[in-house]
Amino acid sequence: MQKQIFFSFVLVMMLLGKVKAQHNNPFGNALIPDMIADASIQEINGVFYCYATTDGYGQGLKTSGPPVVWKSKDFVHWSFDGTYFPSAAKEKYWAPSKAIFANGKYYIYPTINGYMYPAVADKPEGPFKLARGKDEFYKPFTPSTLLQSKNPGGIDAEIFVDDDGQAYVFWGRRHVAKLNEDMITVDSVVQVISTPRKEYSEGPIFFKRKGIYLSLIHISEPTRRR
């Protein structure tokens, strides 16, 4: 009887300790132990890759962490090794999208200092560099940027490749256009996806499941976000 009481006491204390540990952790039981947003996760050759915005905790948009890609073989244990885009490590680096394999290379489309850029590498973990021009991120709408003219909401690129091989790029405020075969230029025809909600939106995710196209967007209102 005493052994049973002692075991019950130990079990209760272990559970209380676990609850306390979770309470002290501001991120809860996070899948990835980092302050990230705009995550895109994909499996490449048996390895899961998570590309995301790395925010400085409590800093908002004033700063961002270096671009790192978290990797895992079991979707439980995650790690990273250095930065995958060294020349952009000190820039404001957001929403890199998932890596797309095409033309024998891997492509990502991060928003750097407020503008979308196509970047290329031989491996999904990089190192990446701009697909066109020098790795310079301070001039808007140069030959290096994904868009060659000003476009409202031109941030947060998301790439979707349809069953026929056609690639599309989605970005802020519900914009979408075809991505050309070179994967670094955009078709001149740009459309806006019609939705019942008309507020400002960003951070699109687009995918196809069981024959149905699904679009997820982040909607912002003056007093709240969704």
Where are the language model's segments positioned?
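Beta-propeller and closely related beta-sheet repeat lectin domains
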Residues: 37-39, 94-97, 155-158, 202-205
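Residue-level detector of Asp-centered blade-edge/turn motifs that repeat once per structural unit
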Residues: 43-46, 101-104, 161-164, 208-211
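Beta-propeller domains
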Residues: 52-80
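Short glycine/acidic-enriched loop and turn motifs that connect beta-strands
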Residues: 55-59, 115, 176, 220
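Blade-loop segments of beta-propeller domains
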Residues: 68, 75, 79-103, 111-113
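Asp-box/WD-like beta-propeller blade repeats and closely related beta-sheet repeat scaffolds
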Residues: 115-163
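Residue-level detector of conserved catalytic or cofactor/ligand-binding positions
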Residues: 217-226
